Amino acid sequence: MVMSDFYKQFAQAVLIAGGIIASAPSVWADSFTINSGETVTATQGGDGGMVDGDTGLIESGGFLNVTGSKGIAFSDGLSTGVSIINNGRITSLNDAIEGPGGDNTGAIVTVINNGVIHTTEDSGNADAVNFTGSNGPTLILINNGTIETFGISQGAEAVVAGGTGHIITNNGTIITRGITADAITTSCANCTITNNGTIITRGRGAHGIFYLNPGTQETITITNTGSILVEAQTSNGILLNNEADTIVNNSGLIRVLDSTEEAIRGGSGADTLNLLSGSQIIGIIDLNNGTDIVNISGANNSSTLTLTDVENINLLNSNGLLVGDVVTMVDPTGQSISSAVLSTTTSAVHNVVNQRLAHNQALKPIQVATSELTSGMMFQERAPQIWGSALGAVRERDLEGIALGYDHNYVGFTGGYEASFYKARIGLLGGFVRSEVKTTGDKFGRIRSVDTDTDSFFVGAYSQYFLGGINLTTTLMAGYEDHKNDRAVVDNLNGLETAQADFSSLFISPSLTLSAPYRAGEQVELRPSMTFTYSGARYNDYIESGTTRSNLFINNRNVHALIGQLQLAAAYSFFEDGEFEFRAGATARYTDDNDIDINLAGTGAAFRIPNVSDDSVYGGYLGVNLRVAIVDRMNLIADVEHGRAGGGEEHLAAMLKLEGVF
């Protein structure tokens, strides 16, 4: 009886356990996690492959190393989807991640790679991510790490997908090495492919992005903000072998090393190519049949592009010339910022004068014990002074509109002689400034668009008049500048080239300063001031050399800049011949430059590009000034200033001055 009850209870337990096992969701069996420090050598997904609802996770430091087969497999006929996250490393002989067969309509497979995916076999069956088939699931692939295939003689592709509605995004690196081993191949309908990272193919006939679909009803969007580098023969950067309507947005680099091949090759559909800010293309551009459109806009390096089989070409920023199927685009940055660069350096010299005169006190009457005034008793003149000042600054400004961001650095020397004259101090000055302007490179460290070195030589005169409680300081300087300019050109047929030119300019720059210093104590003086500085220049015409078909003749032009400055300084005299000054101020810069008239050298084709810099810039600054006597009749002055302005403009300036009294 006891045994009978035992067997009954045992049988019930077996039935219950069997029911639990039979009704358990498949995720229990086919989902997987590979922990950090763990190495797994079996194909993931179980015997039947991953099914709807399954998840896979490889932690950082985890390894899936399958030497005899595929890495991760799926069950055929998905209806909802599967998700996989790789933070570690997947290495497999054949396909690293192989999608399901059968009808997978409506299913979505999400693959996020933050680690490394490798395949090792020299075979066309060793794709890294393989989701072929017209009825495959929708693939959402986000690569933030590295996907690489090592097959040499066979076409082991990094990503290959059929189906519909795929969203493929590369933020990391995709590399293939083999013959016909495309980085991304798809025949899907209505797909989106985005490359924000780096794509490299090294095998013959291996394309960066290859879209193959004979259908006419589909659309596809390809966006490249990163780099697509194709290193072997008969290989294209982007190949559209289809009848679909395709939109290609490029703000990155597409480069093919085979000069007979296309960087972008269109299909027979209506293709639209948008060349946006940062676009650089080296290789043939041929959009083939269909009613194709190329739109060129944004801030870019100068470029010369031959656009083959393009029915509509639109230059949206008016900074280029279209002759036949050749577009000459000119970066207007170098010409547009010339007034801002000039006014920055001239203002630095004016400020040297203003800083030194801020220390001068109004001439005092001689105190004598008599009621009569005779000649020579009105004012006591000071001894003449000779001074010299080294100055320098680093300045930068961000991109604005189609004007690229740039760095402006300068160093120089100015000196002068100063003496008293009646109720004033007057002086002569001269000096030179060597400056460098470079447009900033992009995040890939690619070429700078403009690199200009300038040597400026100037002379001038200044005076300070004491008008009761107000001091009036005027300065007038004029000079000559010698410029050496390099302009980078991206020629899609001839590669990266440099257009070089030497030219000169003349400038004049007066300034006027009103100041009203007054004592706030025995050792403290407040020094409010207001300064207006004008700078005007005429740049002579010049012709470039050094490129195959992109040299320009630049006509002469005038530039103008006006800077207004309000400042409040507080000076503390810590001993008789020593002083520390702190100042704060606000500035406004207004520029008025002509547009740039250009001729394409050797052709006579003339066009005009706009001046695109911001003509009204407002900012502020802080500065400190230290003045000490180092020996008898000789003072040393050190000055540092930091400022910011609209448009992401920032500067740091320094000055070191020595002055001696006769």
Please place each PLM-identified region on the residue numbering.
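Extracellular/surface-exposed low-complexity segments
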Residues: 3-6, 28-37, 41, 274-277, ...
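Gram-negative bacterial Sec-dependent N-terminal signal peptides
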Residues: 1-29
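Transmembrane beta-barrel domains of outer membrane proteins
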Residues: 87, 225, 278, 286, ...
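Membrane-embedded beta-strands of outer-membrane beta-barrel proteins
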Residues: 84, 111, 141, 168, ...
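Outer membrane beta-barrel transmembrane domains
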Residues: 520, 553-662
